[in-house]
Amino acid sequence: MNAPFRGIDKLNEVYFIGIGGIGMSAIARFFHTGGVKVSGYDKTPTVLTKELEASGIAVHYTANVELIPKKVDLVIYTPAIPAEQEELVYYRENGYKVVKRSDVLQIITESSFNICIAGTHGKTTIATMVGHWLRHSGFGCNAFRGGIAVNYGTKF
C-alpha cells in the first residue's frame, strides 16, 4: 500500500479513476480550478461527467490502459472501483502514487483553514451560504458540500 501523499501544491497532473461520482467530481474541480491538469475515467457518461468535460477536463468511458495519461503525478480512485480494474492495476504495478479519495480530502483539509458544518438538518444549505459569503466578501474560499448547490451547480 502506498504511503499518504504530501505535496499537493506541487502537482501538475492528476488522474481520477471513477471521476463521475459526486465526491470525485468535486475533487476534480478543486484541482482543475487550481491550475492542475485533470483527466479521468468513468464507466458511464452522466450530467456530472459532461459538465467536467465542458469545463476542460478530459473524461473517457472505456477502461483501457492505452487511453490513460502516463505522466501523472497522482492517481485518485474511489473505493467503488474494483481492485482488479485494469487502469488501477496498471498505475499500482508501475509505481505511480495511487491514493483513495478520502486520503486526498484529508490532505486538502490539513493544508488549509477549515470551517466545518455539522448537525442533523441543513448542513448543505449552511455550508453553501458560508461559502457564498466568504467568496463574495473578498476572503475567497473553496467549499466541499454534501450536496449540489443550486446557485453553483456543483458540490464544490
Task: Describe the residue ranges of each PLM region.
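ATP-dependent carboxylate-amine ligase
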Residues: 1-57, 71, 75, 128
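Phosphate-binding loop of NTP-binding sites
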Residues: 30-33, 53, 66-70, 79-156
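N-terminal glycine-rich dinucleotide-binding loop that anchors FAD/FMN and/or NAD(P) in oxidoreductases
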Residues: 57-64
